[in-house]
């Protein structure tokens, strides 16, 4: 088991015991080259906070087994879209191949975010199943698509 996986387990356990560790920052590694090339993300470390891990697991119902695979999942996206929120020019939405029920799992990611005194990072701000009409079709029609896997 790798360090990221162990930390996810520890964070979920702590949250279940009533002692959440929201302040922790978990490193997934360097920002994938694809995000740098397609979305203009800087070459910073890609991170997720303990608070987001807790929210994703307990509020969005994404299981620990998927959370532990985030470093691999982020390196093999289905598509990448600009945020539909015009005020979030520092954000992209990564559409994964993973599903929660019938809903595709997406990951909003922001670049160049300061986290306390830890430095500047690219940060996964959430992970959840996008319910409703197919978001891929909707976002393509809105002209938000930056990249899609040609396979």
Q: What spans do the regions from the language model cover?
A:
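Ribonuclease/tRNase effector modules and their secretory precursors
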Residues: 1-151
């Amino acid at each position: 088991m790798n360090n990221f996986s162990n930390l996810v387990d520890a964070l979920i356990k702590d949250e279940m015991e009533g002692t959440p560790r929201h302040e922790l920052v978990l490193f997934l590694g360097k920002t994938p080259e694809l995000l740098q090339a397609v979305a203009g993300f800087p070459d910073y470390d890609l991170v997720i906070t303990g608070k987001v891990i807790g929210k994703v697991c307990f509020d969005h119902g994404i299981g620990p087994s998927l959370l532990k695979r985030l470093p691999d999942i982020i390196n093999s996206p289905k598509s990448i879209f600009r945020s539909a929120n015009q005020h979030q020019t520092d954000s992209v939405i990564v559409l994964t191949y993973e599903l929660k029920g019938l809903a595709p799992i997406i990951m909003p990611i922001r670049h160049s975010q300061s986290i306390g005194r830890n430095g500047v990072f690219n940060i996964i701000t959430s992970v959840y199943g996008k319910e409703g009409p197919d978001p891929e079709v909707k976002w393509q029609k809105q002209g938000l698509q930056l990249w899609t896997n040609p396979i």
